[in-house]
Amino acid sequence: MKIHYFQRYHAKENVATANTMLLLSRLYQYSTDKFFRFLNSLVFPENFEPEIVFRLQEKSSNSVPDATITQESFKIVVETKLSDWFYTDQLERHLSSFENEKQKILLTLAPEYMEAEKQKNFESKLAVYNESLENPIRHINTTFEELVNRIQEAIDDRDYEMQEVVEDYLNYCYHD
């Protein structure tokens, strides 16, 4: 489903998800470098480069093409709640959303971190699920505030347009 500029949802959880995706898409449109810097700080391991890479004369096993343009595959599946009320069975069903991506991230997002015992329970089930996968799924649990903090680290004070978008998002988070 397309991310619209103005959300069309009535359920508060869906509004929060739509507004968060709009914030992230605005960051991407503003600066892909800053978007990928944000992603690297929040979800990707240090050795992962999600940016498009241009190479000349890259050798393969049987040839040397003139040039290649590549981007490592990744997928981030997001589950948003307005409390830490995540359901393990729902999160387990979300695992089937992944296919052959190199980096697979299940991002749980809420105003507060997931309760420790609940997170431990889900992550033990995830570990069993991952045993059969070549590229395991990683679970990242974070908050709206941490998401904003990471975006603010990726942009600087001169990014007035993006600062305004982030400020509006924070206003939404604290007042709606």
Question: What residue ranges belong to the model's regions?
Answer:
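Charged, terminal alpha-helix-loop-beta segments
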Residues: M1-D176
